[in-house]
């Protein structure tokens, strides 16, 4: 009986660690995705400004 309890506690502990690591990995991926979105937005704004300047200058 005691061995069964130890085994169950070990499984619970390992499952908790696995869940925690998965959450950290998911959060890291989400942060990278957010950073890439910001970079894309910056490029889009820059391209829009360049296109407007070309239209204004007539080129």
Swiss-Prot record:
Domain of life the protein comes from: Eukaryota
UniProt key word Ribonucleoprotein: no
InterPro entries linked: Frog_antimicrobial_propeptide (IPR004275)
Coiled-coil spans in chain: 16-44
Annotated compartments: Secreted
Gene Ontology CC entries for this record: extracellular region
Key words, A-Z: Amidation, Amphibian defense peptide, Antibiotic, Antimicrobial, Cleavage on pair of basic residues, Coiled coil, Cytolysis, Fungicide, Hemolysis, Secreted, Signal
Propeptide: 23-41
Signal sequence range: 1-22
Keyword Manganese in annotation: no
Annotated GO biological process: defense response to fungus; defense response to Gram-negative bacterium; defense response to Gram-positive bacterium; killing of cells of another organism
Tissue: Expressed by the skin glands.
Pfam families reported in the protein's UniProt record: FSAP_sig_propep
Modified residues (Leucine amide): 57
Family note: Belongs to the frog skin active peptide (FSAP) family. Temporin subfamily.
Function noted in UniProt: Has antimicrobial activity against some Gram-positive bacteria and fungi but has no activity against a range of Gram-negative bacteria except P.faecalis. Active against the Gram-positive bacteria S.aureus ATCC 25923 (MIC=4.8 uM), S.carnosus KHS (MIC=19 uM), B.licheniformis X39 (MIC=19 uM) and R.rhodochrous X15 (MIC=2.4 uM) but is inactive against E.faecium 091299 and E.faecalis 981. Has a less potent antimicrobial activity against the Gram-negative bacterium P.faecalis X29 (MIC=37.5 uM) and is inactive against E.coli, P.aeruginosa and S.typhi.
The protein, known as: Temporin-HN2
Gene source species: Odorrana hainanensis (Odor frog)
Top-level taxonomy: Eukaryota, Metazoa, Chordata, Craniata, Vertebrata
